[in-house]
Amino acid sequence: MEAIISFAGIGINYKRLQSKLQHDFGRLLKALTVTARALPGQPKHIAIRQETAFTLQGEYIYFPILLRKQFEMFNMVYTARPVSLRALPCVETEFPLFNYQQEMVDKIHKKLLSPYGRFYLHLNTGLGKTRIAISIIQKLLYPTLVIVPTKAIQVQWIDELTLLLPHLRVAAYNNAACKKKDMTSKEYDVIVGIINTLRKKPEQFFEPFGLVVLDEAHELHSPENYKIFWKIQLSRILGLSATPLDRPDGMDKIIIHHLGQPQRTVSPTTTFSGYVREIEYQGHPDFVSPVCINEKVSAIATIDKLLQDPSRIQLVVNEAKRLYSLHTAEPHKWGTDEPYGIIIFVEFRKLLEIFYQALSKEFKDVQIIVPEVALLCGGVSNTALSQTHSASIILLTYGYGRRGISFKHMTSIIMATPRRNNMEQILGRITRQGSDEKKVRIVVDIKDTLSPLSSQVYDRHRIYKKKGYPIFKCSASYQQPYSSNEVLIWDPYNESCLACTTTPPSPSKQKHT
């Protein structure tokens, strides 16, 4: 059977393949289809999403090149589109790598030496995925396209590439660069582009790149972003992710058909000390009742209602003030130090402005940065992004902040709204490799005791326990929006003193009055 290999993958005549496989044809397509899991509280009228690891173009059905071994039993005769790649300048440059990074570089390099090589790197947040990828660029010496989700990450890549490989011509490809038609790999050695721009480019744009690096590869599951895979099949592809299979709906599994199973390295033991300050907040009755949609609690609407409580907003401001003025004299037996900076996480973008206004009244001489606000207004400037590296307080949404954004001087987090998913990535914002390990990491976690979302704290406890962070509990209310009476409820050095658990209490064991 004949097949072609092109940018779209392995192309086989649809009718011939169907005739060859007969009943197995339907089974093949089903195996290459990922169906989203229904989420708790999801309205019934919302269609269940499906994505396929095949695409139809005219008389041909295309599959990821990664699957070509599965077709060997059909004695395929491949006709591959010829690709001519220039070599990048070979200049001996050295930059330090940790042992685990060097081991992974060697493993990836071996895999990507073969034509159409694929590698999906799974490495925890803050452990140097970018540096590993840059080392691969240096070894392969192919024109490289780096695809990133946001401009903030694009700027970080440009900075790292310029620092570590100064002999290469590096450029950022964005909306402004789109107007420059000759901006290709012929003019530059490495181009770093944002997915929202690159996904619109025709397949000819990707032809000169011998290597494509997909940063935050797990995020390419969305219907629009996923289309990029059908344009880069001829290149070697390196996917990077800290959470490759972490989506509640399971849609990130579609990436595996293109990159293979995520490969994880042995990560170093975390050396950051820290603790959690868990505040049990009793909100005003007008704001704590659940919001239901189709007879099910809506987490989004419930959080929105919680943040209408002005006392809860003031509680976050008070905690920011406390962290900002924190000194080594605070009597915790693990010791504390004045934090370099504070990240305040919220669930929705509209809350950024609310908290910014509240914080600005208290911190008149303190630099507060909200990078997403500039993004929403039409693009964040490089100057604004550079300011985040010196800001005392940064406001972010969980969705924006969980990506691979690097703030090495940040050591404290305030979770202004409840959170269940992506907690390891969130904590990774203050535990990045290369940041000051002497600084104690502090997490302020607000538990809304009267809200149905309060049970999410048990999911967060599991992550805190994994990190080895002691948990101190205190209380606050809408009548008293500042925390007090701090009590140690979990000690990693003396687990027998547990006053909290990592699982919710069983309903059958609870006393009813």
Swiss-Prot record:
<dbReference type="GO" id="GO:0005524">
    <property type="term" value="F:ATP binding"/>
</dbReference>
<dbReference type="InterPro" id="IPR050742">
    <property type="entry name" value="Helicase_Restrict-Modif_Enz"/>
</dbReference>
<feature type="short sequence motif" description="DEAH box">
    <location>
        <begin position="215"/>
        <end position="218"/>
    </location>
</feature>
<keyword id="KW-0426">Late protein</keyword>
<dbReference type="InterPro" id="IPR006935">
    <property type="entry name" value="Helicase/UvrB_N"/>
</dbReference>
<dbReference type="GO" id="GO:0016887">
    <property type="term" value="F:ATP hydrolysis activity"/>
</dbReference>
<protein>
    <recommendedName>
        <fullName>Putative ATP-dependent RNA helicase QP509L</fullName>
        <ecNumber>3.6.4.13</ecNumber>
    </recommendedName>
</protein>
<dbReference type="InterPro" id="IPR014001">
    <property type="entry name" value="Helicase_ATP-bd"/>
</dbReference>
<keyword id="KW-0347">Helicase</keyword>
<keyword id="KW-0378">Hydrolase</keyword>
<dbReference type="GO" id="GO:0003677">
    <property type="term" value="F:DNA binding"/>
</dbReference>
<feature type="binding site">
    <location>
        <begin position="123"/>
        <end position="130"/>
    </location>
    <ligand>
        <name>ATP</name>
    </ligand>
</feature>
<dbReference type="Pfam" id="PF04851">
    <property type="entry name" value="ResIII"/>
</dbReference>
<keyword id="KW-0067">ATP-binding</keyword>
<keyword id="KW-0547">Nucleotide-binding</keyword>
<dbReference type="GO" id="GO:0003724">
    <property type="term" value="F:RNA helicase activity"/>
</dbReference>
<feature type="domain" description="Helicase ATP-binding">
    <location>
        <begin position="110"/>
        <end position="262"/>
    </location>
</feature>
<comment type="similarity">
    <text>Belongs to the DEAD box helicase family. DEAH subfamily.</text>
</comment>
<dbReference type="InterPro" id="IPR027417">
    <property type="entry name" value="P-loop_NTPase"/>
</dbReference>
